[in-house]
């Protein structure tokens, strides 16, 4: 019985590995360069100093979202700005320097961005405008899913006379950000 269970477990693990959908022939290794509340350990200049240690072992370093967030200490999942790259992890110049150093060591960089999360700076629907290359971008209340936050957004919209999108959220509800 023990052999059967061990064999089934081994088969299950192998099937899960195959199901991951990795590109054929991919031999790279990615390092997650952050963890929850890793503001000090994941500073751009701290990661950059580790490039020699990473080189030869890791092909990619996965870094936190680099845009300016609503909170001073933020993992980036409450983004206010996508083009302002001064975040809890450092400045835009430090980010660019880290990426350049990684490139020189043949290490790629991949950012953890949850594009449907949007922080606000003035109530539930106060999204700031952002100008990039002469074009102004701004989320509106009509960009917020009709059933966002399990109906809490709709309740707030009714109280303030605000219109939401007619579309429902297709993912899991989460009360931390407007979707």
What is each residue range found by the language model?
Residues 2-10:
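Sec-dependent signal peptide recognition
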Residues 3, 17-21:
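Bacterial Sec-dependent N-terminal signal peptides
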Residues 21-52, 56-60, 64-179:
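Substrate-binding/active-site clefts of carbohydrate-active enzymes
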